[in-house]
């Protein structure tokens, strides 16, 4: 009824089990580290885009000083701002270079009334320019409630800069619940001084 057990076979079998366990633990640990590095890189990219979009919306807001009191946004200005954004992104050691940008401005018709009903968008001065495919989560035309009536007797113009970088499928799988690949976005809004 009893079987003879060879001591040498037990030692070999244990070593085989240890190697198999080591391989599983190694791959699980490597996968966990890959996820942590990806999450870190994703949020680092969002932080870079946030800083760049905030800087650019400040430039758009102050462009009357940069462009000789010209308050109307043009495609040439947007292309220059896009080049600046590309330069800022490269200087932040980002590997992505396929940056898309959308700049929106909203100006309001002159009125003496601070009533919200009298706040109307001036379509001759309100513009939206794209370089690449990039759409904000909320267009600036839906955020007009952020404008306030100034002491100078006018509604204050609004500016929005949205930056988009294409997301790798790895990011999309981790951070996107909708299933389709969406870019990493950052939007900044400013009011005129």
PLM ranges: what are they?
Residues 2-85:
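Alpha-helical assembly-interface signal, strongest on the long, hydrophobic N-terminal helix that forms
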Residues 54, 62-193:
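Short, conserved structural patches
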């Amino acid at each position: 009824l009893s079987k003879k057990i060879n001591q040498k076979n037990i030692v070999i079998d244990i070593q085989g089990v240890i190697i198999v366990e080591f391989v599983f633990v190694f791959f699980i640990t490597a996968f966990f580290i890959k996820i942590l590095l990806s999450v870190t890189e994703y949020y680092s990219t969002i932080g870079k885009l946030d800083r760049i979009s905030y800087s650019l919306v400040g430039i758009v807001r102050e462009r009357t000083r940069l462009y000789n009191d010209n308050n109307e946004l043009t495609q040439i200005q947007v292309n220059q701002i896009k080049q600046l954004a590309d330069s800022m992104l490269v200087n932040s050691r980002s590997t992505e270079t396929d940056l898309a940008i959308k700049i929106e401005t909203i100006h309001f018709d002159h009125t003496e009334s601070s009533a919200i009903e009298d706040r109307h968008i001036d379509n001759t001065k309100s513009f939206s320019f794209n370089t690449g495919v990039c759409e904000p989560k909320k267009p600036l035309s839906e955020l007009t409630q952020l404008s306030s009536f100034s002491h100078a007797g006018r509604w204050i113009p609004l500016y929005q800069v949205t930056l988009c970088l294409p997301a790798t499928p790895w990011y999309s799988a981790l951070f996107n619940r909708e299933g389709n690949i969406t870019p990493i976005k950052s939007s900044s809004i400013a009011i005129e001084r």
